[in-house]
Amino acid sequence: AYGAQGGYYNIMNNYYKLGPASAKDKTHARFFTAYIDDGKNAQDAGVFGYFYVNGNIMDNTCVDLSGEQQKEIASANANNISSTAFKVKNDERTSSDLLLDMRIDILSDYSFMQSATDAYETVLAYAGAWTCGWKDNEYIIPERDKIDRRIVSETANGTYSTNASKGGGYGLIDSQVDTIEKWDEYITATS
């Protein structure tokens, strides 16, 4: 991720799952790149954000990663604010100017947290569109639709089944048309 010219940010307990395209990218071990405002937004030049960065994990299971990339990811996981993991886009400020020692307090109603690994497992277990309900007086056991089953499987296994129609690769797409499949028919009823 990048940006955040102004404001306060907790970047905590996120799980970053690298795909095959990530191994070709120089940001394979980067959690965030902070930008300093250049004055083109609705604020003065030089405005920057403040960040608390901790508990994030960059998955290193992509088979296309080199040994050096594996080391850089291990460094980012061990220290989320290392120069590999957190960058500042220009030379006006150093990362230590932007980083906070304590997380930014938020309303307690919004502060439920899981570890990055637990959050990843929760998403794999529960995310997506689920079919359920009644059909012909029989209850349908909830299950993901086929598209979300494919997406969860590809995420868990680090694989892909689609490519860009205009020449891209490694699972990156140019348009939603590149991923069109026949959608499941969902049961509708009035309540």
Regions found by a protein language model. Name each.
Residues Q5:
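A short beta-loop-beta micro-motif enriched in histidine and acidic residues
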